Amino acid sequence: MRKNRIQTILCIVLSIALIATLALGMNKSKKEKEKIVASKKQYESSINQTSKPEEEAKESNVEVENQGSEEKFILEGKTLLSLGDGVSKGSSYQEKVKNLLNLKSVINNSNNGLVMSSMINLINEEALKDIDIIMIMVGTNDYTKGRALGTINDGGEVESFYGDIQEVINAAKKAKPEAKLVFLTPLKHGYIEGQPSYPDKNNIELGLDDYSKAIKAVCDKNSIPVIDLFNESGIEAENIAQYTVDNMNLNEAGNEKVAKTISESLQKIYK
């Protein structure tokens, strides 16, 4: 009988051990399963985080490419309007620019004696109807006639050279905002009887360079490109006779030189 009792006890102990082992195994399996599920979720999350920046980057690149294509301005086939004083009226550099850049056409509406303030009369919706590029070179007569310079803060209503430039910019933007506006600083010129000549000061103690700097300053303020012929054309006091017929108006060599400078500058501006 004692033997039977011992056997019974052993059976109970073995059963308890078996149940405990099975329970432990099931718990371990559950934890491993949870671990696998957690790892899977973590992997999927990392994939999503990695792909999202790539997708955003692709979208960003598309936007940049689209912006670039919208801003691109092709010079070929465009119509250019040249506004200026007597130096521009009697010159052929505009036609040479047309040939160098393969423009559709060039209209030269320059006149003797024009000053910056008189440009307003040449800028209106009708005059700019078919124009893609407006190119203005004026300032020599303002210098010789002693136009007051004013300050960079002068608006179009102020009677000064700074104010005149701002008024011209405002008029062009209003008449045809999509047209490209470009200013040229005036060329240096030699002795002309009866008027001040570079590098002399005028009757209000201003040099041609002061008017050139004013053009650049106002254009910079308005984000308008400037082709600095005064400093970059290569026409200087010592070689003016080589490039002009009378110390001011351009000869063939002068027109070639100016046309080359303008064409190269326009290509850089609208590259």
What are these regions, as identified by a protein language model?
Residues 73-83, 87-164:
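Conserved SGNH/GDSL esterase-like catalytic core that processes O-acyl groups on lipids
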Residues 137, 184-185:
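Alpha/beta-hydrolase-fold catalytic nucleophile elbow
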Residues 127-130, 175-176, 269:
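Glycine-rich phosphate-binding loop signature in dinucleotide/nucleotide-binding domains
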Residues 98, 172, 218-219:
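A generic structural signal for well-ordered alpha-helical segments
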Residues 165-169, 212:
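Generic structural signal for well-ordered alpha-helices
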